[in-house]
Amino acid sequence: MDKNTHIDTATRDAIEAAAFRHLLQHLRQRTDVQNIDLMGWGGFCRNCLSDWVAEAATARGVALDREAARQWVYGMRYDDYKSRHQTPATPEQMARMDASVARNKAVRGEG
């Protein structure tokens, strides 16, 4: 953010929040993109975003359980999303996701 150091914290937070809302909208529209592929290639998925939303809420004293956070991210109940849009994972997808989870742990210094 070297070139943008003149942006105050409140404005930066508003910009980041708007970008996050746009990401959620995009993911809700792209139901063809499976969570396992997001996780395998990008190291995160809609469930990760849900966990991060719940963690951020808790850090600010807001009670938000896992199901509510998932509904926030998915735009519908998680079970409804899975039944409408989730397809069975292939062995290749599972292997890629497992490797990505291991990479996440290594990057965070957990393994």
Sequence positions of predicted segments:
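Domain-level signature for proteins that mediate thiol-based redox and metal-cofactor handling
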Residues: 2-111
